[in-house]
């Protein structure tokens, strides 16, 4: 685990974005941890979040021309990541996002920001069922751009309804790499360092045994 990944876990714990306990997911599964990126909700939170996303992007080595944030949660993520890339990595790249409803006046169209072209890096909070990615792919393909990759904050590394995860489905269907700031494996490595979190470690390991990929 890299220093920025450990820092991100601690940031998420401090903001109660990441919690350990017992939680029922939309799928009906009982999970020993929960991640709610919507709780990164202040100016400082967003500034820090962008730095973590930018760090993961640079670390990945994936080449891309533009950041795309799917409405709605991807919008602030794309914005703050673009700022962090410019300020901390000297990479001044364009970004854009989609509207849920196309306007028929003013700017018009369903996109805001830069023209959607070239190699697109899609940024979002998490991938649960992959629906937002599929909707975004329709937009990207309609503009004759290509998907360079997808970056999310957390990869839960668990099976969907079949034998593979929603992330693995996206990688298979679109031939792109999905990267994340942290994975379930990183969470477990972090818990292994914390003696006072032994009960959570056992629960997360058991969950991975049952649902992991």
Swiss-Prot record:
Keywords: Glycosyltransferase, Magnesium, Pyrimidine biosynthesis, Transferase. 5-phospho-alpha-D-ribose 1-diphosphate binds at residues 26, 72-73, 99-100, 103, 105, 124-132. InterPro entries: OPRT (IPR023031), Or_phspho_trans_dom (IPR004467), PRibTrfase_dom (IPR000836), PRTase-like (IPR029057). Its cofactor is Mg(2+). Pathway: Pyrimidine metabolism; UMP biosynthesis via de novo pathway; UMP from orotate: step 1/2. One of its GO terms (cellular component) is cytoplasm. PROSITE patterns: PUR_PYR_PR_TRANSFER. It comes from the Bacteria. GO terms for biological process: 'de novo' pyrimidine nucleobase biosynthetic process; 'de novo' UMP biosynthetic process; pyrimidine ribonucleoside biosynthetic process. SUPFAM superfamilies: PRTase-like. Orotate binds at residues 34-35, 128, 156. It catalyses: orotidine 5'-phosphate + diphosphate = orotate + 5-phospho-alpha-D-ribose 1-diphosphate. One of its GO terms (molecular function) is orotate phosphoribosyltransferase activity. Its EC number is 2.4.2.10. Catalyzes the transfer of a ribosyl phosphate group from 5-phosphoribose 1-diphosphate to orotate, leading to the formation of orotidine monophosphate (OMP). HAMAP family: PyrE. Belongs to the purine/pyrimidine phosphoribosyltransferase family. PyrE subfamily. Homodimer. This is Orotate phosphoribosyltransferase. The gene is pyrE.
């Amino acid at each position: 685990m890299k220093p920025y990944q450990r820092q991100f876990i601690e940031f998420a714990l401090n903001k109660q974005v990441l919690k350990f306990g017992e939680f029922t997911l939309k799928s009906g599964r009982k999970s020993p941890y929960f991640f709610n990126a919507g709780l990164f909700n202040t100016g400082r939170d967003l500034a820090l979040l962008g730095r973590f996303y930018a760090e993961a992007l640079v670390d990945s080595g994936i080449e891309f021309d533009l950041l795309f944030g799917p409405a709605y949660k991807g919008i602030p993520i794309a914005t703050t990541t673009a700022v962090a890339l410019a300020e901390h990595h000297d990479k001044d790249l364009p970004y854009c996002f989609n509207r849920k409803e196309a306007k028929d006046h003013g700017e018009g169209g369903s996109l805001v920001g830069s023209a959607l072209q070239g190699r697109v890096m899609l940024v979002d909070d998490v991938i649960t069922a992959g629906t937002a990615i599929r909707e975004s792919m329709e937009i990207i393909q309609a503009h004759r751009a290509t998907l360079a990759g997808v970056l999310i904050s957390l990869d839960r590394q668990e099976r969907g309804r079949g034998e593979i995860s929603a992330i693995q489905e996206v990688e298979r269907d679109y031939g792109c790499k999905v990267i994340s700031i942290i994975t379930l494996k990183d969470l477990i490595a972090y818990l292994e360092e914390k003696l006072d979190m032994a009960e959570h470690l056992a629960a997360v390991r058991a969950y991975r045994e049952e649902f992991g990929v």
